[in-house]
Regions:
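Conserved short submotifs of the Hanks-type protein kinase catalytic core
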Residues: 213-227, 231
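Domain-scale recognition of modular recruitment/scaffold domains used in eukaryotic signaling
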Residues: 2-154, 178
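Catalytic-loop of the protein kinase fold
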Residues: 257-273
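Activation segment signature within eukaryotic-like protein kinase domains
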Residues: 245-246
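A short, aromatic-enriched beta-strand patch in the conserved N-lobe beta-sheet
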Residues: 208-209
Length: 403
């Protein structure tokens, strides 16, 4: 992804010729088909198929490391069926049931559509309407990576150029490598699916996903001024700007609360700054659209940002996001310092859970903001934390009074 491939290379990107192991493989004729959706998960495929006879073709991991093509069909209002595309190693032709074979997958699909022959006699599934790819699904050839911003266990983040024919746009691209586990890929797609729903000026916007081949990519708006944490550490941030960051974060998190999103990882490191230095909530890798999340363990989570009930009972709710927002505000006024300075994670947990300890807000924090954090966000009883809407309203009123 480091540079745009030439035409010859581009036409071969992700192409695999017909294999000899009875699997239908991705070839250029199917990659160009309107109904080919790449590595869209089964859940997303079923959500896209609305009416009886709607269908699409997608890639799926049949067994670890073995990727095949599948046909997904809406059979009834309640039921979708999924069929493997098979390749006869003797005839080198494709089929669903061996009684009829075609030289190409598009020819096989067309035959079933025109003859109205069910994909299988047992299912009775007929192909009526091909489900076209959403504009949200972006071709890999439209993306040119420029600079790596960071890397993770299964992928990297790049600044890239997106060109879909309407002009070039600078974007951020989060990738998922081919060697990632199936669970990691499903979480990756879940993150993209969640972010796609959110449209707010203080939440990072997802433009689309590239999932026709590896690496899988989430394409997002680019925030050139980097993370809030880095900005706080590197610059002497004025009091007015700190208050604005606090207000913008509250606005974005209140929107997520209204959207039933539990973020679970609100922190200065996960807030990005736009060209105009506006704060945007990012990183939805731990998020979910629900009212409560119960975890089995808290091994790899940032403990110093957790609410007491999360530390004790491994529960996340919209109220735990409010607690974490309070820690974010502390970070803003502490110039990006780590919360609970001088304490280990174990000591932090003990002081909060056993001793009901609360940090003192940093010097320079307006008393109105300090009162909201210590008196509302950090209430031991989650119900006394009110709502992010109510908290944002109070902060906004104070911010407006200072203009």
């Amino acid at each position: 992804m480091a540079a745009r491939k030439n035409k010859k290379e581009g036409s071969q990107m992700g192409t695999v010729e017909k294999s000899s192991n009875n699997d239908a493989s991705v070839t250029d004729d199917i990659r160009g088909a309107e109904y080919y959706h790449g590595m869209v998960p089964r859940q997303d495929a079923e959500a896209n198929l609305k009416r009886e006879g709607d269908f699409l073709v997608r890639k799926t991991e049949q067994t670890p490391g073995k990727v095949v093509l599948a046909l997904s069909v809406r059979v009834t209002d309640e039921l979708c069926r999924h069929f493997m595309l098979n390749l006869d190693p003797t005839s080198n032709k494709f089929y669903f049931e061996a009684t009829h074979q075609e030289s190409t997958i598009p020819d096989l699909i067309t035959w079933h559509m025109t003859t109205k022959t069910p994909v299988s006699a047992a299912s009775g599934a007929k192909l009526r309407r091909p489900m076209e790819r959403s504009p949200w699904l972006i071709n890999h050839d439209s993306i040119v990576a420029n600079k790596k911003l960071g890397e993770g266990a299964f992928g990297d983040v790049f600044v890239a150029e997106l060109d879909q024919g309407g002009g070039k746009q600078e974007v951020a691209v989060k990738t998922m490598r081919a060697e990632a586990t199936r669970d990691a890929r499903l979480k990756f797609m879940k993150e993209a699916r969640l972010m796609r729903k959110y449209q707010h000026k203080h939440v990072v916007k997802v433009i689309g996903v590239a999932i026709h081949e590896h690496p899988l990519m989430i394409v997002m708006e680019f925030c050139p001024n980097g993370s809030l944490l880095s900005h706080l550490k590197k610059n002497k941030v004025a009091a007015g700007e700190k208050l604005r960051f606090t207000t913008e974060a509250a606005d974005g998190i209140a929107y997520l609360e209204r959207s039933k999103c539990i973020h679970r990882d609100i922190a200065a490191r996960n807030c990005l700054l736009s060209q105009k230095n506006e704060l945007k909530i990012s990183d939805f890798g731990m998020s979910d659209s629900t009212d409560e999340i119960k975890e089995e363990k808290l091994d790899k989570v940032p403990l110093k940002w957790l609410a007491p009930e999360t530390m004790q009972d491994k529960i996340y709710t919209h109220k735990t996001d409010i607690w974490t927002f309070g820690v974010l505000v502390w970070e803003i006024y502490a110039d990006g310092s780590e919360p609970y300075p001088g304490l280990t994670k174990v000591q932090t947990r003990a002081k909060i859970v056993v001793n009901d300890y609360r940090m003192k807000m940093p010097d320079g924090t307006p008393s109105q903001i300090a009162d909201i954090v210590t008196g509302t966000c950090w209430q031991k009883n989650p119900e006394k934390r009110t709502t992010m809407d109510a908290i944002h309203k109070k902060i906004r009123e104070f911010y407006d009074s200072k203009k």
